[in-house]
Amino acid sequence: MDLTVKTLEGKDAGKVSLSDAIFGLEPREDIIARVVRWQLAKRQQGTHKSKGRAEVSRTGAKMYKQKGTGRARHHSARAPQFRGGGKAHGPVVRSHAHDLPKKIRALGLRHALSAKLKAEDIIVIDDLVANEAKTKALAGAFASLGLTNALIIGGAEIEGNFKLAAQNIPNVDVLPVQGINVYDILRRGKLVLSKAAVEALEERFK
């Protein structure tokens, strides 16, 4: 499929052909959802922790004698049923990450790109270069292109002035092409690709 290439000033700068093997798939929500769950599980901190009965600071002595009181049998006050006792089966520090095959991860990215193209939410920009590191000027250019909520993917490296100017614009994320991922594609309204990013993606998936 051919898309018109734009400049940051909003002018046409030719056309680019997008590979159907990357951008032309019928999006599968189940695969995209699997990749998003994998990403979010991997970034989850897992620092949750509660103290069990072996860790709470209370006496370990038997509360009262076993027989003759008419009351229920108990050992120490650390037991979970008592106020101040340890938590039974409480959270522990752990990693929430789980495995996902590389083929599924790659397929999920292609389906996310295809979903964006199907929704007509992909814009290809000729070159992501700013003459000066001025947020106001770049924000105006983005507004004229309708980029109020966007993920911008550049080449292997983001040009310095562009990176500095863009980093303070709300709801706009800028990543090099090696940082492209399913979750960030979906959480932003528009996906902006530089020509270098398109070439890198086609090289990656060929």
Swiss-Prot record:
A Pfam match: Ribosomal_L4
Keywords assigned by UniProt, alphabetized: Ribonucleoprotein, Ribosomal protein, RNA-binding, rRNA-binding
Any one biological process term the GO annotation gives: translation
UniProt key word Kinase: no
GO CC term, one of those recorded: ribosome
Chain residue ranges for the region called Disordered: 63-93
Bias kind Basic residues: ranges: 64-77
The keyword RNA-binding belongs to this UniProt entry's keyword annotation: yes
InterPro entries the UniProt entry points to: Ribosomal_uL4 (IPR002136), Ribosomal_uL4-like (IPR013005), Ribosomal_uL4_dom_sf (IPR023574)
GO molecular function, one term: structural constituent of ribosome
Family note: Belongs to the universal ribosomal protein uL4 family.
Entry function: One of the primary rRNA binding proteins, this protein initially binds near the 5'-end of the 23S rRNA. It is important during the early stages of 50S assembly. It makes multiple contacts with different domains of the 23S rRNA in the assembled 50S subunit and ribosome. Forms part of the polypeptide exit tunnel.
Oligomeric and partner information: Part of the 50S ribosomal subunit.
Name of the molecule in the record: Large ribosomal subunit protein uL4
Species of the source: Rhizobium meliloti (strain 1021)
Taxonomy of the source species: Bacteria, Pseudomonadati, Pseudomonadota, Alphaproteobacteria, Hyphomicrobiales
